[in-house]
């Protein structure tokens, strides 16, 4: 009875997390072309100029290995791409976009993996780095890589699924706050115990057993919940890194990127 009650609770949690998801399995964050005027061309927001410096540093790193200006934080997944993909493939499949996920009207910079092309659009779910603009500067938010998947939900929650081995797997649900910091909704993780593995939960995103409450969830149920989050994450439309030098951020909505969703 206790397990059925807990399972009902986390299913309810999933329904809340997926609120706003809609009826399509792969919700797509759209891009919008704005009228190009001379005045708009001159009025480039300062955050966009600063984000352009970050994207330019990633472009140079992928293109020729120059990491002089590559941000120290948020480079793990980007370095993996350069290590395992050929130069041209990396420039084609690594993408960038601007999207307001904190709700403050100023977009974040998202860098991620392009998994498919449909029409003229390039789409993917895996995010390698997120940067925000707070206190007049670019600020690192979060990163993903091969063993720590970072994805976006339809309600702009960020979901991390990763781990350091079969005995320590993590599912974290967080949200970017307007001050540039991540707020933790909750975290589930596995941890060794006397008779095998336990599944724990806390609300502070600390993955230590002594800082969390053990649940009645089985490891199989935990893995099922992780899969549900992955299935309901949204696709993001990226601009390929290879086009950055000639395109910049052209084609992306400025300032109020969540308004067209």
PLM feature spans:
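Bacterial N-terminal signal peptides that target proteins for export
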Residues: 2-10
């Amino acid at each position: 009875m206790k397990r059925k009650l807990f399972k009902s609770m986390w299913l309810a949690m999933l329904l809340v997390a997926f609120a706003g998801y809609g009826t399509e399995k792969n919700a797509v964050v759209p891009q919008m072309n704005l009228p190009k005027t001379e005045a708009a061309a001159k009025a480039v927001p300062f955050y966009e100029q600063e984000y352009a410096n970050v994207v330019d540093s990633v472009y140079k790193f992928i293109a020729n290995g120059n990491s002089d200006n590559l941000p120290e934080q948020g480079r793990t997944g980007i370095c993996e791409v350069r290590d395992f993909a050929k130069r041209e493939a990396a420039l084609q499949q690594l993408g960038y976009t601007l999207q307001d996920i904190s709700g403050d009207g100023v977009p974040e910079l998202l860098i991620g993996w392009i998994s498919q092309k449909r029409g003229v659009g390039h789409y993917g779910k895996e995010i390698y780095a997120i940067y925000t603009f707070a206190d007049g500067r670019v600020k690192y938010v979060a990163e993903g890589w091969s063993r720590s998947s970072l994805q976006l939900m339809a309600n702009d929650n960020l979901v991390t699924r990763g781990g350091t081995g079969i005995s320590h797997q993590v599912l974290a649900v967080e949200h970017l706050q307007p001050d540039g910091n991540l707020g933790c909704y909750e975290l589930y993780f596995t941890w060794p115990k006397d008779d095998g593995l336990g599944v724990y939960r806390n609300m502070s995103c600390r993955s230590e057993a002594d800082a969390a409450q053990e649940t009645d969830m089985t490891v199989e149920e935990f893995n099922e919940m992780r899969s549900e989050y992955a299935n309901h994450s949204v696709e993001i439309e990226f601009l390929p890194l290879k086009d950055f030098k000639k395109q910049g951020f052209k084609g992306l909505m400025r300032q109020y990127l969540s308004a067209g969703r």
